[in-house]
Regions:
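Mono-ADP-ribosyltransferase
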Residues: 1-256
């Protein structure tokens, strides 16, 4: 608290009175501690271990929506000690379910803004951190599966009109090692008549296995989606398509 009092004295009374919650206090201390370490590095023992965040990482850490993901840094460091914890936290936040306090950190919002080209500070830093993490995570080569419901018009424009062509996506692409997870996504009731159920069978070359740090890893939640994530901008050959007996479209993609 003494160091913190020197760095940002205005917060001390709020901490002592319990107005600032512990998790917020911890992140705030880290935020100011980085500058303190940088400005006073000659006084810091060489064996003193501390995470000093860069500008991009600071922007991510100080967002309230990342608190849950950042609270798991000890776990990340045990699983992948060579990957910066903030990068792993960005992947975890991306995979979290939408909630009242976490609408803008999830895959749906991030991908929506990436695909629409809508500027947003959080999406910019989070997507950069996710891409950095993916470059360090285990590569998966083999077949993976993705389930999606989409309008006939969108299906036609994005895939059916491009058999034999190479296509790409401005957003990240989630998939699973097993068929059961995507089948759950497309088997939900209430799909409009104008939409079709689609299963993508993807031959992965550079997809990254995020199953250990995903929100749905069998530890943070009981469900394990065995997720393989493709970086934004990944290119795929639309090899072929077929229609199953129940009307589900199956699109075969080959990562380029």
């Amino acid at each position: 608290l003494k160091i913190f009092e020197t760095a940002c004295p205005a917060f001390v009374p709020l901490i002592e009175e319990g107005i600032i919650e512990n998790d917020i206090m911890d992140l705030t201390i880290q935020y100011y501690m980085d500058d303190f370490i940088r400005d006073n590095d000659k006084y810091i023992r060489e064996d003193f271990k501390v995470n000093v965040y860069n500008k991009t990482e600071k922007t991510f850490v100080r967002k309230r929506r990342t608190n849950l993901a950042m609270s798991r840094v000890e776990y990340y460091n045990k699983i992948y000690p060579h990957i910066p914890e903030v990068q792993q936290a960005a992947v975890n936040a991306y995979t979290q379910a939408i909630s009242s306090g976490n609408k803008g950190a999830t895959s749906r919002e991030i991908n929506r803004r990436l695909r629409n080209g809508t500027e947003d500070e959080y999406v910019d830093v989070a997507s950069r951190l996710i891409s950095q993490a993916l470059s360090r995570l285990p590569k998966y080569e083999g077949v993976v599966y993705r389930g999606e419901t989409m309008s006939i018009k969108k299906l036609q424009e994005r895939f059916l009109d491009h058999i034999g062509d190479v296509v790409s996506d401005k957003g990240f692409i989630s998939s699973s090692l097993y068929m059961d997870t995507p089948m759950k996504f497309i088997s939900r009731a209430g799909i409009p008549k104008s939409h079709k159920r689609v299963i993508f069978e993807i031959q992965s070359k550079n997809g990254r296995n995020i199953s250990n740090i995903s929100e749905f890893n069998g530890i943070f939640t009981l469900e394990n989606q065995h997720e393989i994530l493709f970086d934004k901008g990944t290119k795929f050959l639309v090899k072929k398509r077929r229609i199953e007996g129940d009307g589900t479209y199956r699109i075969i993609l080959v990562e380029q």
